[in-house]
Structures are given as C-alpha cells and as structure tokens.
Amino acid sequence: MSQQETHGFQTEVKQLLHLMIHSLYSNKEIFLRELVSNAADAADKLRYEALTNDNLYEGDGELRVRISADKEKGTVTIEDNGIGMTRDGVIEHLGTIAKSGTADFFKKLSGDESKDSQLIGQFGVGFYSSFIVADRVTVRTRAAGHSADEAVLWESAGEGDFTVETISKQTRGTEITLHLRDDEKEFADDYRLRSIITKYSDHISVPVEMFEAGTPAVEATEDTEAVAATEGSWKPMNKATALWTRNKSDVSDEEYQEFYKHISHDFTDPLLWSHNRVEGKQEYTSLLYIPAKAPWDMWNRDRKHGLKLFVQRVFVMDDAEQFMPSYLRFVQGLIDSNDLPLNVSREILQDNKVTTALRTAVTKRVLGMLEKLAKNDAEKYQSFWTEFGQVLKEGPAEDFANKERIAGLLRFASTHTGEATPNVSLADYIERMQEGQSKIYYIVADSHEAAANSPHLELLRKKGIEVLLMSERIDEWLINHLTEFDGKKLHSVTRGDLELGELEDDDEKEAQEKLQTESEGLVKRVKDSLGDKVSEVKVTTRLTDTPACVVAGEGEMSTQMIKLMQAAGQDVPEPKPTFELNPEHPLVARLNDEQDEQQFAQWSELLLQQALLSEKGSLADPSAFIKLMNQMLLASVK
C-alpha cells in the first residue's frame, strides 16, 4: 500500500464541476447514463486490446456492467470488468480535462442556465456528472494485465482536490461509488435505477446488470404446490445487443436518439439519422447522425472528428476521420465493416481500398440524407443550414467528385427575398432567371448590408436581375472553387464587365457606345490625373445612381480574397483597381466641366477614395481622405 497523495484539480475541472452542479440540476439522472456509457466503453476497449493479448481477460471474458444501491448508506455503485486504469491514468483522466480548446469553451458560457446546460452537454461531462448527485465519489480501479497490488483508490468531494493511493483489488476494471447528497437519496433505490437504465442505456451492447434478490421456499398447501427457494442473481436490465445490428423496423426513434446521446455525449436529440446495412462486394453497416446543434469547438483545428469504427461488431477506434471528409466533420455515428482486419490501425486505414470505398459510400449517404431533408422539409433544412452551412461550404474545394451535389445543398441570401437569411438555392436562382440570362450573378462583401447596398447592383436591380448576396468569410474561398452550376457560370458583379449579353437590347447597347465615345476625353483626363493609382479608367456598365466605383480586373484577386489571405498572414500585393465613372451622374458631369486642373485632380481623387471606401470598407490613409474632403467642403462654402 502506498501513502495517500493529494492532488489539485486542473482549474478547468473546478470550473466544470461548479457549472455542472448548477446548470444540469434539472437533468440530474443523466449521471447514470454517462457512467454506464463510460463503463461500456471500457469493456469495448478491453475486447479490442484482448484481440492481440488474450491474457488481459484473466480467465473472465464475460464483459458486463453492474449497478447496485445501498439505501442505508445512501450509495450507488457502478462496476465494470473492462480495461481499468493505472495510477497515472487515474490522475490524468479523473483530474484533468484532456481536450483542446477548453479555455474557448468556458468563454462561450453565458450564465443562462438552459443555454449553458446545452453547451456543457456538447462538451461531454462524463465521469464528472457524478457530482451532480454525490457529495463524495470513490473510485477503485485496476488495469487489465496488472497485478492485484497495483490497483488504485481515488477519492474526492468534487471541490478543490482529490486523493490517490495504491490498494489491492483482485478483479480488473473500475468500481465507482457515489455517496449521494442528502436530497438525492431517491437514486439509492433499485426501481429508480432500473427505470433510468431502461430509459437511457437499453442500447448498450454489454449487459447492464442489477441484482435480483432470491425468493424463500413456500411449503405446499391443500390448494397449492410447494415452491422451491431461489437464489439471488445478477440479471441484465438491457437488451445487450449492438443496436446497429438489429433490423431498422425493430428499433424505435427513442432508441436511436438515446444511442446518439451515448456515442456523441450530446444532450439534445439529433436532427436526423440513417441506418443502413449493405451486402455484396462491400459488407458493412452504417448508422449516421446529423446533430441538431453545432458543437462548441466546430472550428478548433485540433478537434477530433470522425466515426466510431467497429470490425465485425468489435470496437476498434473512436474518431476514425478517414471515413468522413472534413466538410462533413459534424456527422456522428459509426461504421461496422466485415472487410477490414481486426488489428487495423490508423496508418493501415490511410491507404486502404476498403477505407476509400467506405468513405465514398458514407459520403454519398450523408449527401443523400441532406438532399432528402432539403426537398421534404425546408424549415428543418434551414435549421441544419444555420448550424452547419459554413462547414458544408468547404465541400466544393475538397470533394471534386461531389461538387455539383454539394453545390445543390448550398443556401444564399439574395436580392429576390430582400432578407439576410440565406435560404435561396442555386436551383431556385436558375428557375427565376430571366429569358436570355446565361449567368448566375453574385457579390461577396464584408457584411450582408454591404452586399445588399453595394452600388455594383444598381443596374441589375433596375433590370430586375437577381443577385446572390454573400458575406461569410468562407464565401470567397468557395466561389473560387465553384465556378458553375447546372451549366451556368457564376459571375461576380464586382469583377470585369457584367456581360449581360441578351439582357441588353440594341437601343441600350447603342446608347452605351455613344456615352463611351462622348466620355473619351473625360476618361483620359481622369486617368492622367490619377496616374498609377488605377490600372484603367472606363465608363461604367453597372451604375445608375452612384458617381463611380472600383472593380477588379478579370483574372485578378478580388478585394475579399485579398482580405482573406492577409488575415491568414500572407503578404499579398494589392492589384490596381479599374475605376469606373458614371457620366450621367451630376457629380461626374460637374467634374467634366471643371477647367481648373487642380480642382479637377481633387475631384478625381475624392471620387476614387469614395469608391475604394465603398468597396473595401476602409482606406489605406483615412486622414488624407478627410483632409481632402474638408478642403473641398470649405471651397464650396466660400
């Protein structure tokens, strides 16, 4: 026996314990679900490790979880004969939160109990949920393959610290005893525990057992036969079969939902799921879930994602990311293959034909689920899009084979609806295209307001041509990889010519040519005045109400792409913009009449800076712009 050691909880654990006790109080029975789930995982891990080392079973291969209560002592005990933990493992797993992004998680907490409980559920509280109902927790554990004298006793009141000491334990596995708070003694009741197991843990694939007391002998009477005494025994409270191996028709929605909560540690029901068994060239079963809410650490680069992998119903690994592309990293679930070796490793999965085929199949399955949802329940799909739309937008750059299908699932804001809500599909847009229209017009800006109010839309609005309004950071990246849909090119209204084609009649083209001819002198004067600040000056084809605008040339980087790359730390030289003038605007007409070359230069500079500010949202030298504007305002009032 070793001397008892006291360790302090990691700061984040203290915070989590405090939050959990206060935020999850209304859903306190989940402690049993979490602990049974952990115990089942420990059994799965032992089963996998024992594939290459049968001695780990120590002569006992019947894996199970046992739950018991002691009313007098006010305790509940959850015991498993799974993989167990070493002393170092106990300190690591029961004293710290080994998750990247933990600090970010705590920043997201708002103080609103209902919102925070949902976030805490997404975070996954696991073992620490014990302290929702217990004021002291005792853990006795021994790792499989270690001697009886290498067992560990861990104890804590869930406050600042915990104690650890080495003890003797004959059986492998982990035994957790909860010393219930005075107002939580209802859980020290067999009937209450049975009802929770039935509710939350029926899908667990190892038996979850409780002790059933024996019955005394009954002597025979004139009317009845004698009944022999029966001994008490441990009886399973759950079906103890892997849920995904059952027929879909035999699994209820409630069971699917509880299984999702078991594998994801999410407290909320999933949005939808798909359960499929495939036989033939590939033999596998998949159970895939789309969550209702995005995880708090969705954008954390170190976040683990992927499916649980089983081979012939034996658990092999968590977070097998090889089966799901990054743009579908929100998908939860499992895949059970009959074609992979049981000793498969992440390295073997990397370049494996079976893995590639399974990845292709489950990717198509998820896209099919989303297509069906979008078609049959637009409101529910909109809910999905709000949570995961930005992630799905990574798809066209990542998955060339499914680019068109992914594009069909994208949603955008549009001038057609006048709303900021992105609820317009590319198919919707094409359906509303005007006769003679050959392009899908879009604009990318810093915000929805900037996109909707951009001067670049003026002529298109006047002609009733719909424009997709994009304002998320990923949109410029997306649009660089999604250049057409259903045979229609996507065309930026802020780059090059509008290329209206048949949308302009002969009279309009003639008037435009006439305007360009009449403005040749003005265009040359402005270019001479601005010099190399602009690449070109030309008469606009897109403005009706604004005096001037800047556009990127064909093939040049857009303003938004430059911002994106600069934000990523890349040094990007900014190309000179094309400066477009609207000769029919009074300010440009005034400019054309100006004979004083100094005044002309100031007016030209002012219009250029205005156009740059409108396009970029900022200026390289705002002080110089304000000084120029003040000079001109003073001149106008003299």
From Swiss-Prot:
SMART domains in the cross-refs: HATPase_c (SM00387)
Any Pfam family: HATPase_c_3
Gene3D superfamilies, sorted: 3.30.230.80, 3.40.50.11260, Heat shock protein 90, C-terminal domain, Histidine kinase-like ATPase, C-terminal domain
Cellular compartment(s): Cytoplasm
Organism of this sequence: Shewanella pealeana (strain ATCC 700345 / ANG-SQ1)
Name of protein: Chaperone protein HtpG
Region spans: B: 347-563
Family: Belongs to the heat shock protein 90 family.
Region (C): 564-638
Function as written in the Swiss-Prot or TrEMBL entry: Molecular chaperone. Has ATPase activity.
CDD domains attached to this UniProt entry: HATPase_Hsp90-like
Subunit structure as annotated in this protein's UniProt entry: Homodimer.
GO cellular component assignments: cytoplasm
Broad class of where this protein is predominantly found: cytoplasm
Keywords: ATP-binding, Chaperone, Cytoplasm, Nucleotide-binding, Stress response
Alphabetized GO MF terms: ATP binding; ATP hydrolysis activity; ATP-dependent protein folding chaperone; unfolded protein binding
PROSITE patterns: HSP90
NCBIfam families to which the protein is assigned, alphabetical: PRK05218.1
Region (A) residue spans: 1-346
